[in-house]
Amino acid sequence: MAKTLTIRYTSDTHGYLYPTNYADMQDRPMGLMKLASEYPHDGNTLIIDGGDTIQGSPLTNLYQRLSPEEKAACLSEDTYGTHPIAAMMNLAGYQFVTLGNHDFNYGVDALMDYLTNLDALCL
């Protein structure tokens, strides 16, 4: 009996959650929220990210500049302490990630904040 395996792969999302280009505020076919809404969770699909994930958008740049107190004020109780990109990737069902060079831009502490909140296995 033949089975089908589908691989969904992202790379270089650079912290974009929303399908919006902030320069002109137009919807685009981009962003983790747009992509994740299309992922099947059927047991036959692997969802993988190739890195350069946590740096580059206005959201991730702001997140890295917030103090722990400011993060607590912005996040609800059920998401407090969860890196926003990790939270979205967890909801999307990512199973595996690798790291890209830009994932190191904010330093080791920021990278570990992301990885420790991520359900996916970092290869």
Please state what every model-predicted region is.
Residues 1-123:
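Acidic, metal/ion-coordinating pockets
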